[in-house]
């Protein structure tokens, strides 16, 4: 097997003055050509994780890890100049809000060319040709004319295609896609997902996909890590977790998904709400909402244990099949 593109071991993020870490004990590996989805509801720490890896958090953030290795280099320990060299080159990001991610004062072509010139060098004409190639690759119609367009002259879907072109312009080893379809309508979402998947297959890039949408996960991801209140509660191959979720939170997420077929009742909901940093419990952070909770769950965080090859779950009641008929 090829060496992993990214190895993260025990990543934690805490902001100055905060009573608890917003990300705690996060560990995962991303292999070449594979897609890992970080899944969870708003505020679970998905985007903070991505910004920590990119080095884009404010100075008030304290980021620690036993290991955060990108292609053999220490992401957290490297000089800022080296990190700037990696960002936009071997390590790229597609942000979730295409309407505000591009600079309104510069044309699309100027912004694409800047990315190429910053990391590849070469002439203006070569950079312009590369920018044109990338717009054509992401299927922007009338690509030559679009080079001279300003962001406000493009639709949201077109802007997101430009963001994808910019991320892929220098053939990155890893793409971090933070909710890349959130601001788009359903039809455009499907087109963007298909585009990302085809370009990833073409380039062999690895990807971290950040999303709350399990439908998106099923469409494009190979592995998934389910996050709740800053911690991973379950991880494993996508097909395995969809077929046999073993954490009560994962089970609740699956139960809340709408289906195309006939429904006999209401969609499932998860009672309660995510604890704020002030309310973080000593034990399992899902305990206050869990129908299977034990007294021991409130004492200490349950460790991630392997239930099946590749599938890990942080739950004292796993496997849940033993308790589905008799919740506590």
Q: Which residues fall in each region the model found?
A:
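Conserved ABC ATPase signature
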Residues: 149-154, 158
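ABC ATPase NBD coupling module
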Residues: 75-92, 110, 118, 124, ...
């Amino acid at each position: 097997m090829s060496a992993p593109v990214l190895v993260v071991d025990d990543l934690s993020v805490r902001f100055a003055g905060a009573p608890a870490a917003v990300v705690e004990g996060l560990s995962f590996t991303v292999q070449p050509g594979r897609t890992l989805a970080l899944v969870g509801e708003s505020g679970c720490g998905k985007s903070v994780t991505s910004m920590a890896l990119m080095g884009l958090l404010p100075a008030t953030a304290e980021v620690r890890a036993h290991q955060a290795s990108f292609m053999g280099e220490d992401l957290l320990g490297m000089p800022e100049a080296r990190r700037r060299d990696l960002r936009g080159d071997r390590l790229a990001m597609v942000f979730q809000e295409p309407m505000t991610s591009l600079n309104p004062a510069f044309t699309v072509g100027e912004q694409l060319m800047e990315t190429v010139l910053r990391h590849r060098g070469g002439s203006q004409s070569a950079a312009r040709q590369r920018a044109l190639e990338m717009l054509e690759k992401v299927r922007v119609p009338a690509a030559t004319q679009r080079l001279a367009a300003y962001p406000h002259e493009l639709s949201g879907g077109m802007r997101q295609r430009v963001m994808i072109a910019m991320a892929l312009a220098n053939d990155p080893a890893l793409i971090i896609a933070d909710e890349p379809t959130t601001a788009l309508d359903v039809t455009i979402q499907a087109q963007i997902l298909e585009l990302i998947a085809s370009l990833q297959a073409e380039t062999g890039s690895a990807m971290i996909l950040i999303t709350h949408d399990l439908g998106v996960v099923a469409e494009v991801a190979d592995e998934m890590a389910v996050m709740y209140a800053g911690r991973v509660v379950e991880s494993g191959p996508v097909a395995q977790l969809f077929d046999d979720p073993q954490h009560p939170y994962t089970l609740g997420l699956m139960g809340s998904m709408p289906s195309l077929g006939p429904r006999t009742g209401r969609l499932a909901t998860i009672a309660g709400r995510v604890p704020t940093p002030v309310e973080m419990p000593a034990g399992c952070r899902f305990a206050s909402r869990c129908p299977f909770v034990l007294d021991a769950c409130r004492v200490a965080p349950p460790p991630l244990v392997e239930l099946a090859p590749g599938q890990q779950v942080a739950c004292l009641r796993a496997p849940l099949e033993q308790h589905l008929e008799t919740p506590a």
